[in-house]
Structures are given as structure tokens and as C-alpha cells.
Amino acid sequence: MATAVRAHVWVGGKVQGVYFRAATREAAQRQGVAGWVRNLPDGRVEAVFEGPPAAVQRLIDWCRQGPPAAVVEQLRVAYELPEGLTHFEVLRS
């Protein structure tokens, strides 16, 4: 079994008001990835993904496009030590 990884992700562009957080939660649940997602005051979306490396990478790749109404212009990823998250949630902005 692969060791879990943790990716801290920031997505910029037209990513708020386009169902990005809810769609990210759905994509994470399909991949079996834990973590969270939230809107930032500066217009970006911030997320943390924890899970098997391949599943986390698929979710990062999904974020490069996001849901149909999104226009992703920037994606920043920082890898961190996993914290053992067990579910995925949308945090209040």
C-alpha cells in the first residue's frame, strides 16, 4: 500500500462563484482523497488533499481545469507532511 501524501493547493483565475468548491469535494470523494477546500478573500481557492500519491495527483490534475464554468489561470502546489485527515469538507470562507 502506498504511503499517503499531502498537497496544499492554491488555484487562481475565475474560480469563485463557479461551483469550484463543491465540484472539488465531489472529485476528492471519487478519488478517495481526504482534506478540505475553501474560498480565499483574494479570489483564489485553497485546498488540502491527503491520500495515495496517484489519487492526489489525479485531483491536482483535475484542479488545472476545474468545473466547466471555471477558468484556471494559476495553480500552486506545496507538498507537506500528511496529518492523517479522514474525510473531505468544504470550509466556510
UniProtKB/Swiss-Prot annotation:
PANTHER family noted in UniProt? ACYLPHOSPHATASE
- Similarity section: Belongs to the acylphosphatase family.
Cell inner membrane is among the record's keywords: no
Q: Sorted alphabetically, which keywords does the UniProt record give?
A: Hydrolase
Q: State a single Pfam family of this protein.
A: Acylphosphatase
Q: Which residues form the active site?
A: R21, N39
* Lineage, highest ranks first: Bacteria, Bacillati, Cyanobacteriota, Cyanophyceae, Gloeobacterales
What InterPro entries does its record include? Acylphosphatase (IPR020456), Acylphosphatase-like_dom (IPR001792), Acylphosphatase-like_dom_sf (IPR036046), Acylphosphatase_CS (IPR017968)
Which branch of life, at top level? Answer: Bacteria
- What are the recorded GO MF terms, alphabetically? acylphosphatase activity
Q: What is its EC number?
A: 3.6.1.7
Give the matching PROSITE patterns: ACYLPHOSPHATASE_1, ACYLPHOSPHATASE_2, ACYLPHOSPHATASE_3
Q: Which reaction does it catalyse?
A: an acyl phosphate + H2O = a carboxylate + phosphate + H(+)
Q: Which SUPFAM superfamilies match?
A: Acylphosphatase/BLUF domain-like
Q: Which gene encodes it?
A: acyP
Describe the location of the Acylphosphatase-like domain by residue ranges.
Answer: 6-92
Intrachain S-S bonds? none
- Please report the name of this protein according to its UniProt entry: Acylphosphatase
- Which organism was this protein described from? Gloeobacter violaceus (strain ATCC 29082 / PCC 7421)
